[in-house]
């Protein structure tokens, strides 16, 4: 930590080389990517909180590179904040048991930090951050905050922010640290993007049938193809300057589609794929029915 010269009153903080737990870090985190699944899990935990509980916390799971962290999943962790005594209690045994269980399902996802459903950063946050810094050692722990207060007075609710901590003071203590904000963005796959678009739409309607959903998807594809054709024609005619990145992406996309096939061959391949899908659906229904019959027979015996 260093103070600026006389021409400025700003306080300059170097990204941490260590944390309050005494763990050395080789390189600071420069960005955080969050998947929607993790955010929905945090919201679900908040909605199921105990009466009178100000905020809930939990463990973040994901992957990391040298400079970035990708948050893919999370799980809740019971905790208690005692304002009178100025103490916070975290159920560490529950945290470690849940992590061992998650490792059996997804061994590639490790602890990357923790979340809280409150934008407030206080002494309790510093103490919890110190605990998770030990769990993620020798890497830095990320603290993700979610603002769940949607009262209409703010331009946008559910503000997502992420931080890393830096020790403060000549003698570092667990409760003395400063939180440094990190760039945070939403990372989603194509199926997740479709689901988010459906949730964000304001239209209230009955669930679509499979054929209706297919028709909507085909219309969206047709609309996207029209946009691509308009762009390509504008580039060819010289009305718009071409982008090499867009051109490479279009080339990779087109190369995936089988070319040089006549209509009969393409129809044969499509029908074969359709038969495979129907067979998988039929087998899934058979397994589901067998499981239900087995469970009912178990109850009778």
From Swiss-Prot:
Write out the GO cellular component annotations: eukaryotic 43S preinitiation complex; eukaryotic 48S preinitiation complex; eukaryotic translation initiation factor 3 complex, eIF3e; eukaryotic translation initiation factor 3 complex, eIF3m
* Keyword list, A-Z: Cytoplasm, Initiation factor, Protein biosynthesis
Molecular function terms, GO-annotated: metallopeptidase activity; translation initiation factor activity; translation initiation factor binding
Question: Where is this gene product found?
Answer: Cytoplasm
Which segment of the chain is annotated as a signal peptide? none
Q: Which InterPro entries match?
A: eIF3f (IPR027531), EIF3F/CSN6-like_C (IPR024969), JAMM/MPN+_dom (IPR000555), MPN (IPR037518)
PROSITE patterns from the entry? Answer: MPN
What protein name is recorded for this chain? Eukaryotic translation initiation factor 3 subunit F
């Amino acid at each position: 930590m260093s103070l600026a010269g006389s021409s400025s009153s700003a306080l300059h903080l170097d990204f941490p080389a260590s944390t309050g737990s005494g763990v050395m870090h080789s390189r600071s985190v420069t960005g955080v990517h969050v998947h929607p699944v993790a955010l929905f899990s945090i919201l679900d935990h908040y909605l199921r909180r105990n009466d009178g509980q100000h905020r809930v916390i939990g463990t973040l799971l994901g992957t990391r590179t040298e400079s970035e962290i990708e948050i893919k999943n999370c799980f809740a962790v019971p905790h208690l904040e005692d304002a009178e005594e100025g103490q916070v209690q975290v159920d560490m045994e529950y945290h470690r048991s849940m992590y061992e269980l998650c490792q059996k399902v997804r061994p590639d996802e490790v602890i990357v930090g923790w979340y809280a459903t409150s934008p407030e950063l206080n002494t309790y946050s510093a103490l919890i951050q110190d605990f998770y810094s030990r769990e993620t050692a020798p890497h830095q722990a990320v603290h993700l905050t979610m603002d769940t207060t949607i009262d209409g007075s703010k331009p946008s609710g559910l503000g997502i922010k992420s931080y890393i901590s830096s020790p403060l003071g000549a003698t570092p203590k667990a409760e003395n640290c400063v939180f440094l904000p990190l760039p945070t963005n939403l990372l989603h796959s194509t199926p997740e993007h479709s689901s988010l678009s459906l949730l964000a739409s304001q239209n209230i309607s009955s669930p679509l049938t499979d054929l209706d959903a297919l028709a909507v998807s085909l219309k969206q594809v047709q609309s996207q193809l029209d946009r691509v054709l308009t762009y390509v024609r504008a580039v060819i005619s010289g009305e718009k300057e071409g982008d090499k990145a867009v051109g490479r992406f279009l080339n990779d996309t087109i190369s995936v589609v089988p070319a040089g096939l006549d209509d009969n061959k393409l129809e044969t391949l499509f029908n074969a794929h359709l038969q495979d899908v129907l067979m998988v659906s039929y087998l899934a229904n058979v397994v589901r029915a067998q499981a239900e019959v087995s469970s009912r027979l178990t109850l009778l015996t």
